[in-house]
């Protein structure tokens, strides 16, 4: 947590106050992993954090405000995904490594933020523009640099010249990775082995970007 932290009434929180606020967020994050978002109450979060509802309300007006704060944390962490794509080579064995690194990084990011990402998807599906904007920012961390990579490959004559726009293709690839990341158990029930998901995603991402299978 960086920058100045203030309470709901505008006072600057001291070191202990910041620690309490962060503990409340951490406890909320854990609860979202085991309880439906709509069932989480202020009193439950406060109790888990070892404090009172009154203390919770010093830092957040309601549970939704705290959830949005957690969502912003996911947005900040998504910046690391951009680095897995921007400026990376998609040629030869380097291209294979780029695809594998992106898939590994994306799956790791999703596992870390799984609970809050599910809440973001729920809020976005219900039409809440705040969650729609947050989801767009998370996806954009990969879609934008991936679209630039596709355009670069096409400009060098290494990819398919015709076909969907780079943005549409990049968006489809990111949506595919997100869907696989969020549904591993159901895919396993359908016969997809966990160990095969990452290489399958890397293959499809590489094909989508370059139009070719990865180099062996």
Please give the residue ranges for each predicted region:
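Helix-turn-helix
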Residues: 23, 27, 31-65, 69
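Amphipathic alpha-helical packing segments from all-alpha helical-bundle domains
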Residues: 76-82, 108-112, 119-122, 129-155, ...
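Short amphipathic alpha-helical elements of helix-turn-helix/winged-helix folds
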Residues: 27-31, 109, 145, 176
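Hydrophobic alpha-helical connector segments
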Residues: 65, 69, 83-112, 166-173, ...
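Alpha-helical DNA-contacting segments of helix-turn-helix folds
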Residues: 32, 66-74, 120, 124
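Hydrophobic/aromatic-rich alpha-helical bundle segments in the mid-to-C-terminal region
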Residues: 118-121, 132, 153-202, 212-216
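Actinobacteria-biased recognition of intrinsically disordered, low-complexity terminal regions
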Residues: 1-8, 214-216
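Generic hydrophobic, amphipathic alpha-helix propensity
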Residues: 16-28, 45, 70-82, 146
């Amino acid at each position: 947590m960086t920058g100045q932290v203030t309470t709901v009434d505008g006072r600057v929180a001291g070191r202990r106050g910041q620690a309490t606020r962060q503990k409340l967020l951490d406890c909320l994050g854990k609860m979202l992993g085991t309880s439906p978002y709509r069932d989480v109450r202020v009193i439950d979060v406060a109790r888990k954090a070892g404090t009172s509802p009154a203390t919770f309300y010093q830092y957040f007006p309601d549970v939704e405000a705290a959830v949005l704060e957690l969502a912003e944390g996911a947005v900040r962490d998504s910046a690391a995904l951009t680095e897995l794509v921007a400026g990376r080579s998609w040629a030869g064995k380097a291209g294979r490594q780029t695809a594998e690194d992106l898939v590994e990084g994306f799956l790791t990011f999703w596992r870390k933020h799984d609970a809050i990402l599910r809440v973001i998807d729920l809020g976005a599906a219900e039409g809440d523009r705040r969650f729609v904007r947050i989801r767009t920012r998370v996806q954009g961390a990969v879609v934008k640099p991936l679209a630039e990579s596709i355009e670069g490959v096409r400009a060098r004559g290494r990819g398919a010249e015709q076909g969907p726009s780079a943005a549409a293709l990049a968006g489809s690839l990111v949506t595919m990775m997100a869907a696989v990341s969020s549904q591993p158990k159901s895919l396993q029930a359908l016969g997809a082995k966990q160990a095969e998901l990452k290489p399958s995603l890397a293959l499809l991402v590489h094909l989508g970007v370059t139009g070719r299978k990865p180099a062996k």
